[in-house]
């Protein structure tokens, strides 16, 4: 009997989910300062966040934060970010192939674009609902400032969960689910599908082998396309999640307030750090994801051969 090679053995759902979660956590740790800079730029210009400190550009925001609030502030909210990736990315990315195969109904032909989009929408929707509380806590910890003697709303991750649930309501932990769902519908539909299509085009046309350079280029292209399309929903999501009770009656109200007071460019605030963060996050996550899947399947094959 001829055994399958490692490249021919498809990773199990468990391997994909585990690999996605670990890879996403690693990517988040490395790129978190960019995410914090993005949040600060996105909320800049709001009434409640107006201050004498103005952030300019990616490096300017990072250095200003480090000088005025200390380097640790760049990683404020990281525990919630890690929790988010464990509950969110592991499902959104890890289950993508499995759901895609389900929509393909076991056909031997490659999945259609519709199958890929449907898989991205389903995994993204489930992941947003499960991971939304971690998103709320992460954004609020990143947004709060310790300047001018202002007492912070929250002293830490678990304190934030408790304060939000007890002083606002338990349902507030799911605040901003609608714009976050919109954002992740765009991200999943663009990021995973673009990465999938780009990787397939490079490999099938024998431009690049299915290895690190191919994964790197595919991730960069997916990152740019995703950032451009998802930026408006991302800014509205951040503003709405970070808002005080009653500040914005609804998500459309938040969007209209931004448009009338700050203009259409407000929807692209923080675009550069958002792209740098998402592109670098994509590169780290997808490259680690692909390599980790391969190594885990190699280990599994080795164990199967010895038993």
UniProtKB/Swiss-Prot annotation:
Keywords: Ion channel, Ion transport, Membrane, Mitochondrion, Mitochondrion inner membrane, Oxidation, Repeat, Transmembrane, Transmembrane helix, Transport. Has no constitutive proton transporter activity and has to be activated by long-chain fatty acids/LCFAs. Inhibited by purine nucleotides. Both purine nucleotides and LCFAs bind the cytosolic side of the transporter and directly compete to activate or inhibit it. Activated by noradrenaline and reactive oxygen species. Despite lacking canonical translational encoding for selenocysteine, a small pool of the protein has been observed to selectively incorporate selenocysteine at 'Cys-254'. The gene is UCP1. It is found in: Mitochondrion inner membrane. Solcar repeats lie at residues 11-102, 111-201, 210-295. SUPFAM superfamilies: Mitochondrial carrier. This is Mitochondrial brown fat uncoupling protein 1. It is a multi-pass membrane protein. It catalyses: H(+)(in) = H(+)(out). GO terms for cellular component: mitochondrial inner membrane. Mitochondrial protein responsible for thermogenic respiration, a specialized capacity of brown adipose tissue and beige fat that participates in non-shivering adaptive thermogenesis to temperature and diet variations and more generally to the regulation of energy balance. Functions as a long-chain fatty acid/LCFA and proton symporter, simultaneously transporting one LCFA and one proton through the inner mitochondrial membrane. However, LCFAs remaining associated with the transporter via their hydrophobic tails, it results in an apparent transport of protons activated by LCFAs. The modification Cysteine sulfenic acid (-SOH) is found at residue 254. InterPro entries: Mit_carrier, Mito_Metabolite_Transporter, Mitochondrial_sb/sol_carrier, Mt_carrier_dom_sf. Most probably functions as a monomer. Binds one purine nucleotide per monomer. However, has also been suggested to function as a homodimer or a homotetramer. Tightly associates with cardiolipin in the mitochondrion inner membrane; may stabilize and regulate its activity. GO terms for biological process: adaptive thermogenesis; cellular response to fatty acid; cellular response to hormone stimulus; cellular response to reactive oxygen species; mitochondrial transmembrane transport; proton transmembrane transport; regulation of reactive oxygen species biosynthetic process; response to nutrient levels. May undergo sulfenylation upon cold exposure. May increase the sensitivity of UCP1 thermogenic function to the activation by noradrenaline probably through structural effects. May undergo ubiquitin-mediated proteasomal degradation. Fatty acid 16:0 binds at residues 56, 269. One of its GO terms (molecular function) is cardiolipin binding. Residues 33-73, 134-178, 233-266 are mitochondrial matrix. Residues 1-10, 97-116, 196-212, 290-307 are mitochondrial intermembrane. Pfam families: Mito_carr. Belongs to the mitochondrial carrier (TC 2.A.29) family. The chain crosses the membrane at residues 11-32, 74-96, 117-133, 179-195, 213-232, 267-289.
């Amino acid at each position: 009997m001829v055994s399958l090679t490692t490249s021919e053995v498809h990773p199990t759902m468990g391997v994909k989910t585990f690999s996605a979660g670990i890879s996403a956590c690693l990517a988040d740790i490395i790129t978190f300062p960019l995410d914090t800079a993005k949040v600060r730029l996105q909320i800049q210009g709001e009434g409640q966040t107006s201050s004498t400190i103005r952030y300019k550009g990616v490096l300017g925001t990072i250095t200003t934060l480090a000088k005025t609030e200390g380097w640790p502030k760049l990683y404020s909210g990281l525990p919630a970010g890690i929790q988010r990736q464990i509950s969110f990315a592991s499902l959104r990315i890890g289950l993508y192939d499995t759901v895609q195969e389900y929509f393909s109904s076991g056909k031997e032909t490659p999945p259609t674009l519709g199958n890929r989009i449907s898989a991205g929408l389903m995994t993204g929707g489930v992941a947003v609902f499960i991971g939304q509380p971690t998103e709320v806590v992460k954004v609020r910890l990143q947004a709060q400032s310790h300047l001018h003697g202002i007492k912070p709303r929250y002293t830490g991750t678990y304190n934030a969960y408790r304060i939000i649930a007890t002083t606002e309501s338990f349902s507030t932990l799911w605040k901003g689910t609608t714009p976050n769902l919109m954002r992740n519908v765009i991200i999943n539909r663009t990021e995973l599908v673009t990465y999938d299509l780009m990787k397939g085009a490079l490999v099938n046309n024998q431009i690049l082998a299915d290895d690190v350079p191919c994964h790197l280029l595919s991730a960069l292209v997916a990152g740019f396309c995703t950032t451009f399309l998802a930026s408006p929903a991302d800014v509205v999501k951040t503003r709405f999640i970070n808002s005080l009770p009653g500040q914005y009656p609804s998500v459309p109200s938040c969007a209209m307030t931004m448009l009338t007071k700050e203009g259409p460019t407000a929807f692209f605030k923080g675009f550069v750090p958002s792209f740098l963060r998402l592109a670098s996050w994509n590169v780290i996550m997808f490259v680690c994801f692909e390599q980790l899947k391969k190594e885990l399947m190699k280990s599994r094959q080795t164990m199967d051969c010895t038993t």
